[in-house]
Amino acid sequence: MKSSMKMFAALLLVVMCLLANEMGGPLVVEARTCESQSHKFKGTCLSDTNCANVCHSERFSGGKCRGFRRRCFCTTHC
């Protein structure tokens, strides 16, 4: 009886380890996004598209309007 309980516990442990590995799936890592206020954008930022276009001219990957004062912030992967 004791050996069958030990065998059952060992088998249960192996099954749990296998299931834990299967549930994890591949690990995906996203790059961080860094922001910097645009130096060329003038005025209140009302359009993300306009902000992104100005940021592209500053060699950033994109841009968005942010904050209470609606400033253009350029974004890039860092």
Curated annotation (Swiss-Prot):
Gene Ontology terms describing biological process: defense response to fungus; killing of cells of another organism
Top-level division of the source organism's lineage: Eukaryota
Annotated S-S bridges: C34-C78, C45-C65, C51-C72, C55-C74
Tissue: Highest expression in flowers and to a lesser extent in leaves. Lower levels in hypocotyls. No expression in roots and cotyledons.
Protein's name according to its UniProt entry: Defensin SD2
PANTHER family, per database record: DEFENSIN-LIKE PROTEIN 1 (PTHR33147), DEFENSIN-LIKE PROTEIN 2-RELATED (PTHR33147:SF129)
Keywords for the protein's UniProt record, in alphabetical order: Antimicrobial, Cell wall, Disulfide bond, Fungicide, Plant defense, Secreted, Signal
CDD domains: Knot1
